[in-house]
């Protein structure tokens, strides 16, 4: 049972700065998210101005524009790492999604993994390799097996993610990953059903939405599967048993709170055939494109996209930052 967020503001009297673009590798996805968010916000009755933090003139407009809330459609570095959150807090402008701390921790897969483990949230075995570190591929294979996932630590949208097998492929993936980011997370490969769970709220009020099962057309849920039309099928609620559903939702809320997140997050999981479940990462600014999972989860509990956007604005106004 999902309890809708009570709305105490009037959308028609609320000026929204929709922040999108930025300078990260996820800029194209951010702009696509902004298209969906802008349509939803305008349908809800808001006055919406889209601004790009990568443009100095837009930053000045953000300061001087008399906005009531910044609605974040920024993905990746500069948008999900605490940077824009710190700027917005400095100028006293409420904003959607997580604060400085939650954003900074969640974007770093290596740090998030530490918090998962401390909270008893199952997550695949892994190791961190930083740019400039001496490493031995044979050591990686000995610890994690000869099939692994190599992930750029602070990139999203499956940028810098490689599923590789054998020492040669692992070595190439490590080199490529460290060209993209300053460190990589190397994880034991896990084969299973891909699941994701949206959480809304914070602390004791955080609640999980229905679990979504992701069926990618490619071998894994990569960039193309996420954003190309027809790249993946989303089944909501997921075709898993009640116990697995409850466990995913419990771990998603635990991850949301352990990382200090607020507003809306989406945590990705893998479920093996034997019932073992693994948390992979938590996204603090979930996508809002036509193929995104956040609107799908909201629809499953009877919440339209404009209604969802309104709830996100309300949580921004209510946040104690």
Language model features: what each stretch is:
Residues 1-101, 105-107, 111-114, 118, ...:
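ATP-binding N-terminal substructure of ATP-dependent carboxylate-amine bond-forming enzymes
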Residues 18, 165-250, 273-278:
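Phosphate-binding site of ATP-dependent enzymes
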Residues 116-117, 141-159, 181-191, 195:
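ATP-grasp fold ATP-binding core
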Residues 49-53, 184, 188, 262-274:
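A short glycine-rich, hydrophobically flanked beta-strand micro-motif that places a catalytic Asp/Glu
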Residues 30, 124-126, 147-172, 194-196, ...:
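Glycine-rich phosphate-binding loop of ATP-grasp-fold ATP-dependent ligases
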Residues 48, 94-95, 123, 148, ...:
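Hydrophobic beta-strand scaffold residues
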Residues 2-14, 118-120, 241-321:
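ATP-dependent carboxylate activation and anion-phosphoryl transfer catalytic cores
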